[in-house]
Amino acid sequence: PIKSSAASDVYKRQKYLYSIADEGVEAFAIQPDGDLIPINKKWIGGMRGCYVELDDEDRYLFVGGYHDGRVSMMRLSEDGGVAEIADGIFHKGLGRGVAERASRPHVHCVKVTPDQKFLCAVDSGLDHVKIYRINYERGRIKLADILRCELDSGPRMIRFSVDGRFAYVLCELKNTVDVYKYYVEDDQPVFERVQSISTDYEDEGIACNASGIEHSADGKYLFVSNVGINDVIIYKIDKNTGMLTLDMETRISGDYPKALAVFPDGHHFVSLNHDSNEIRTFKINYEKKYCLMDARPVQVETPNCIYCLLYTSPSPRDRQKS
């Protein structure tokens, strides 16, 4: 097991897995049967991270630091291991809001734009998404723009549409998904907000914090989990405008759905219920607009993150080699 993992990402050819670890980041080789073999660990130049992200060509590993507001850029070696620190930037300043977490920077998520030109660092303490230009040749990141979110909105995560034209920023304090049109103009990133839709659609007066966000592989649906209400909201995505409409809501029968994942088939999702120490799987009926728990809960101590891979059984030749 990986000790105290907060986030993980997988090499695009599914050969290696990278995870947050107490020591910084850790690299693993993925075996044909899904087992993990440790490769190495590396310090990230700051306090413990909370999010990892790879570029599409698996050249660099980017790490976001919640506790110290640091964004780190790590080189990768040919054997899949993590090499030296290429670059690192500490976010500075004070948040504008009254919430305790807004007193200083907290980088909660780092995400490479679909065109691979920029790195988005979501800072829930500053209510910013800082956009860094990536220089792959030199191994450097440089601030290109700042997406300023609403006061005390607490931006937590960012995801991009399958076609790369739209960005979805999940705000955990405001309980919204902010939808942006994304494009590049004169070599500069442009984010135009086109919608802000609530994740607390019933507004029952229960304390609620939006927590997890993912989309289906076909790009037709966006999934959001809410802590407090303990539910998952499914939105339908308009392929032309990127805007969202509520499709269905499911109570997850667990406590604190910190993260979620959508299966590659798009007809199942899993909820990681951190405080009830379990993972629950649900089957989606899009036609009748409901979800049903599809299996018994899997007991996992305080789950933080999950990564879904389409598993292919090893061939007889591969089994003989192993």
Please provide the spans of the model-predicted regions.
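Single conserved hydrophobic/aromatic residue that forms the stacking wall/gate
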Residues: 1-7, 11, 311-322
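Asp-box/WD-like beta-propeller blade repeats and closely related beta-sheet repeat scaffolds
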Residues: 41-60, 64-107
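Surface-exposed loop and turn segments in beta-propeller and other repeat-based domains
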Residues: 87-100, 194-204, 300-303, 308
